[in-house]
């Protein structure tokens, strides 16, 4: 299983010096996040020695062999099942309580029997983003639910205000954190959304030991925050916690811009990644930039606006090079009748170039969100990754 428990166990087995294989039925580990975030975590696990098998599951066990759905056989000495949890609702059903996948409760965590409350991993709580019933086995919500039940038994009329699914996991030297819905969930629920990617620093880049963090923000047309994901070495969960708190208070991307957070070079930048994410989203909503994503590249003219020396070190397949410093003098090389996507290293320079071209009358220009750094994540083949 490639969830939190499976990953944590795999890390500890590697630290003990054991040969470790992790098998996951889906095409990625970590279901709460989208593929591009999970891909960075997968590469970290492979780098540390975990043999990852994705898009495959266990068909059967023998005494010392596992047979996979692909009919491949794996010898083993120890097998650990970390394949998730399922609510135990037998007692609730026998008591005549209304159940679905879990026990049905109202906002007071009261079941269909007014004298019985339920809390924890066996209840269906409402999703904070969609309002739909969901199962989210997380310790934080379960503990708060216990207090709410105690309050209501004592007559304080406390309500549970839905589950965001805020979570974090350590994967060797990386941290992955998220809150709200991911892109897959928004598509399944048919919730309209925008997305942006920002590479931010754990603290000021000119201060030693600054790490790069990739963030993915999902938001609605009116600026409501629908989901946040991040992966990096340090400072990830701090920013996700801040954005989760803004979400909890029904804040918007504008509130992310306005957030006044701690700043000193060892801890952050004058414009924290939370602020930058809000600004990037706000630019999209105001029409200051047209965002483009990996799936848009194949149908467009791609222009890399980085210096030629950097362009030659690696670029998006098929991209031509017009450095931003030359773009005003080379307008005649840029088509006006085709979709043009500008790319740089992480998305900032391509945004600036898109603004220059917009002021020159180009209305067919897009900025590739996340830039070449994100592109490398998505196209790079993981060494030792096995698929069914």
Residue ranges and their predicted role:
Residues 1-3, 346:
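Glycine-rich Rossmann-fold phosphate-binding loop(s) that bind the pyrophosphate
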Residues 4-60, 138-141, 159-184, 383-385:
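Rossmann-like dinucleotide-binding cores of NAD(P)H-dependent redox enzymes
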Residues 18-21, 51, 115, 339, ...:
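Residues at the starts of beta-strands that form the adenosine-phosphate
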Residues 55-59, 63, 70, 324-326:
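Conserved SAM/SAH-binding loop
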Residues 67, 73-148, 242-246:
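FAD-site-proximal beta/loop scaffold in flavoenzymes
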Residues 122-234, 265, 269, 273-300:
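Mid-to-C-terminal Rossmann-like scaffold of FAD/NAD(P)H-dependent oxidoreductases
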Residues 234-253:
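A short, polar/charged loop-to-alpha-helix boundary motif
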Residues 254-301, 307-341, 345-388:
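Rhodanese-like catalytic fold shared by cysteine-dependent sulfurtransferases
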């Amino acid at each position: 299983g490639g969830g939190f428990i499976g990953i944590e166990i795999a890390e500890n087995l590697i630290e003990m010096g054991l040969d470790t294989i992790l098998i996951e039925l889906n095409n990625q580990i970590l279901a709460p996040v989208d593929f591009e975030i999970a891909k960075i975590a997968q590469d970290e696990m492979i780098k540390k020695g975990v043999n990852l098998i994705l898009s495959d599951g266990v068909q059967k066990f023998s005494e010392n062999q596992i047979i996979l759905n692909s009919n491949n056989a794996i010898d083993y000495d120890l097998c650990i099942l970390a394949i998730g949890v399922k609510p135990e609702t037998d007692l609730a059903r026998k008591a005549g309580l209304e159940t679905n996948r879990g026990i049905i409760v109202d906002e007071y965590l009261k079941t269909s029997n007014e004298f019985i409350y339920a809390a924890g991993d066996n209840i269906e709580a409402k999703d904070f983003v969609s309002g739909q019933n969901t199962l989210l086995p997380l310790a934080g919500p379960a503990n708060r639910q216990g207090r709410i039940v105690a309050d209501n038994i004592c007559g304080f009329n406390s309500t549970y205000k839905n589950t965001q699914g805020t979570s974090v996991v350590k994967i060797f030297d990386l941290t992955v954190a998220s809150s709200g819905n991911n892109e897959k969930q928004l598509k399944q629920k048919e919730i309209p959304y925008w997305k942006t990617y920002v590479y931010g620093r754990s603290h000021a880049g000119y201060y030693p030991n600054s790490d790069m963090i990739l963030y993915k923000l999902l938001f609605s047309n009116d600026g409501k925050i629908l989901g946040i994901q991040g992966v990096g070495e340090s400072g990830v969960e701090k920013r996700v916690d801040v954005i989760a708190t803004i979400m909890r208070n029904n804040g918007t991307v504008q509130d992310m811009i306005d957030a006044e957070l701690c700043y000193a070079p060892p801890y952050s930048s004058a414009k924290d990644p939370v602020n930058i994410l809000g600004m990037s989203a706000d630019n999209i909503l105001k029409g200051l930039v047209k965002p483009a994503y990996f799936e848009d590249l194949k149908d467009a003219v791609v222009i890399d606006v980085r210096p030629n020396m950097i362009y030659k070190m690696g670029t998006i397949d098929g991209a031509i090079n017009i450095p931003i410093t030359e773009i005003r003098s080379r307008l005649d090389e840029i088509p006006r009748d085709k979709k043009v996507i500008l790319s740089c290293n992480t998305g900032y320079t391509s945004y600036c170039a898109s603004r220059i071209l917009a002021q020159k009358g180009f209305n067919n220009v897009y900025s590739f969100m996340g830039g070449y750094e994100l592109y490398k994540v998505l196209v790079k083949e993981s060494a030792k990754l096995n698929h069914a």
